[in-house]
Design a protein with these regions (language model features):
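C-terminal outer-membrane beta-barrel translocator/porin domains of Gram-negative envelope proteins
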Residues: 339-484, 488-492, 496-498, 537-543, ...
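C-terminal beta-signal and terminal closure region of outer-membrane beta-barrel proteins
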Residues: 502-569
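Hydrophobic core residues within well-ordered beta-strands of beta-rich domains
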Residues: 230, 311, 327, 363, ...
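Bacterial N-terminal signal peptides
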Residues: 20-32
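N-terminal secretory signal peptides that target proteins for export/translocation
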Residues: 1-16
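Membrane-embedded beta-strand positions of outer-membrane beta-barrel proteins
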Residues: 213-217, 234, 246-250, 283-287, ...
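Gram-negative/organellar outer-membrane beta-barrel architecture
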Residues: 147-151, 163-370, 531, 540-562
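Periplasmic polypeptide-binding modules associated with outer-membrane biogenesis and secretion
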Residues: 36-221, 227, 233, 249-266, ...
């Protein structure tokens, strides 16, 4: 992560600070400075006109100091800076020193276009009136053209900046913009307006490519329905220029490694997110369809088909956010349905289904916390799910449609050495006192939970998983970015049901993985794990029964919409 840009010319700032109110600053992110030309830098003001004391006598005994226009600092705080001047003979030089002291105090507090002005005044009574000009940001001008609407960027800067203008607030707003996945880089310059304390922010915004598309191959499905799958995925970071995102994929299953099952194995998902406010309130819509056919012997002769649908709508709102911490809250409504056919006829196989049908709805509340620093990243999300009885649920009598589950996911990534070795710890937890259908149960086994076992090796109402691993960089590019990681890992999990047999079943493994990520759109991973619990091998031809999990994704991004951006060096 690149650090926030620094002042372009500190010498100019000091010179201008000593001449009056500081009215120019440029922020850059390791890029060429916008708008430089021969002679004086663009945006650097000439010294302010002389605002000295017109009617002041050569010397006067200063009896008091009054302040006008200050809101950031109280009269008492400002007076404390210059109180030693009171009671002494004061001339023009001393008055200028008072003005500079107060202006310096504003500048040191990052109010870079605020300061003190001593207007022409009659000081025969010994009282000095110091006028405080507290600066403001009047306009944000995006100087180039792009697909992303300018209001998306400017509103998020205004969200962080208030009057009077503080440099720390402005840098924070710019950093939030820079971190946005739609933005590749920004160039900014803070330039003076026509009046004292008035400033404008000029920006050049370079957007990321809008669309991405790719292909993937993996063995991340249960072997019973064909572990290998081919995937076509696509996405856009900015579909309609409002900053909205759309992501989708379509997958085909494969029976063993011999024949692609196009008719019955096609699954797809779509997820759409629309920002509603400058506070990053987002509307999220989702749809997922999964159609499976049991391919594994001896059940493949029964012609068992499963059709599952999921619909969701949600709102997400950040509650607190700074450059290191973010706390957000998501409220989501979700409806799931499943239909099972055996030889073309509805048939109840899974517990809780009625004539092969299952329908459930739930309201999910998810607080989420993220912490980021140079050394570590911590992310945690907990989801409280409340089953609903209002939307015509279809469940067996032994299941309560108004169920409750509590699920937690957390990860800790820590840099443990100077050569970019990472310690990664992942935690999963689900708890419920209710008996829930398989769509709401937690699965243990597979590359995302307990490596070295089949996907969905255990499916239980309650579960706990911890997975520590070390990621050793074994190959880096010329810039020092790690491309290949060697990953030893240990996975441990335990699962149990809420009703019926409550025996806790443990599942644990150890192994080694390797990942290769040469670009943002190309990734490869291979994991081998040894499961220490023997559940019996049902298909000697499946790689998952040998503890092997793989994935390959090849993609590309296209359409750079930015016009008149600063060229890359």
């Amino acid at each position: 992560m690149e650090p926030i840009g620094i002042l372009r010319t500190a010498t100019n700032l000091r010179r201008m600070r000593n001449n009056g109110i500081c009215l120019i600053m440029a922020l850059t992110w390791g890029l060429t400075v916008m708008g430089q030309s021969s002679g004086e830098e663009k945006g650097t003001l000439p010294p302010l006109k002389d605002l000295g004391i017109v009617e002041a006598p050569k010397e006067v005994v200063l009896k008091g100091i009054e302040f006008d226009g200050n809101t950031v600092f109280s009269d008492e705080e400002l007076f404390a800076l210059v109180k030693e001047r009171v009671g002494k003979k004061t001339g023009v030089e001393e008055l200028e020193a008072i003005r500079k002291t107060i202006s310096q105090h504003y500048f040191d507090a990052q109010y870079v276009n605020s300061g003190a002005v001593i207007d022409a005044q009659d000081m025969s009574n010994g009282v000095l009136v110091v006028r405080i000009v507290e600066g403001r940001l009047d306009n944000i001008n995006i100087l180039n053209e792009g697909w992303l609407r300018s209001g998306y960027v400017t509103s998020r800067i205004h969200r962080e900046v208030s009057d009077p203008l503080n440099l720390d607030d402005l840098k924070r707003g710019l950093e939030f913009v820079r971190r946005d996945e739609k933005i590749r880089k920004i160039n900014t310059a803070l330039v003076p307006g026509d009046e004292l304390g008035q400033s404008h922010l000029d920006m050049i915004v370079t957007e990321n490519r809008v669309f991405d598309v790719g292909l993937g191959v993996s063995n991340r499905r249960p072997p019973s329905v064909g572990a290998e799958e081919a995937e076509v995925y696509f996405g856009t970071k900015n579909l309609t220029s409002l900053g909205d995102t759309l992501r989708g994929n379509y997958t085909l299953s494969q029976e063993g490694m011999e024949e692609w099952d196009v008719d019955d194995g096609g699954n797809y998902s779509l997820f759409y997110s629309l920002p509603l406010t400058r506070w990053d309130t987002t509307l999220d819509l989702g749809y997922n369809q999964s159609d499976y056919v049991i391919l594994e012997e001896p059940f493949n002769t029964l012609d068992i088909e499963s059709d599952t649908r999921m619909y969701s709508v949600g709102l997400r709102q950040p509650i607190y956010r700074d450059l290191q911490h973010e706390l957000s809250l998501t409220l989501k409504g979700e409806h799931r349905r499943s239909d099972v056919l055996v030889s073309g006829e509805p048939f109840s196989i899974s517990p809780g289904s009625v004539n092969g049908q299952t329908r459930i709805s739930a309201l999910r509340l998810s607080p989420e916390y993220v912490y980021r620093s140079q050394e570590r990243v911590i992310a945690a999300r907990t989801t409280f799910s409340f089953g609903l009885d209002e939307l015509n649920p279809i469940l067996g009598d032994e299941f309560d449609p108004e169920y409750f589950t509590w699920m937690t996911q957390a990860s800790w990534v820590e840099s443990v050495s100077e050569n970019d070795t990472l310690l990664v710890v992942k935690l999963f937890h689900q708890h419920t006192d209710d008996r829930v259908v398989s769509m709401e149960q937690f699965s243990l086994g597979g590359v995302n939970t307990i490596r070295g076992y089949r996907e969905n090796q255990l499916i239980r109402d309650n579960a706990f998983i911890i997975s520590p691993e070390l990621r050793f960089p074994v190959y880096k590019d010329r810039y020092g970015k790690a491309l290949v990681y060697l990953i030893p890992f240990v996975d441990y999990g335990i699962g149990w049901n809420s009703n019926g047999p409550r025996e806790r079943e443990e599942i644990y493994s150890g192994g080694l993985g390797v990942t290769y990520n040469p670009t943002d759109h190309i990734s490869m991973s291979l994991y081998w794990g040894h499961g220490f619990e023997d559940f019996g091998v049902r298909n000697n031809n499946d790689l998952q029964d040998d503890g092997i999990h793989f994935q390959l994704r090849l993609g590309t991004a296209f359409w750079d919409p930015t016009v008149n951006a600063v060229p890359e060096k």
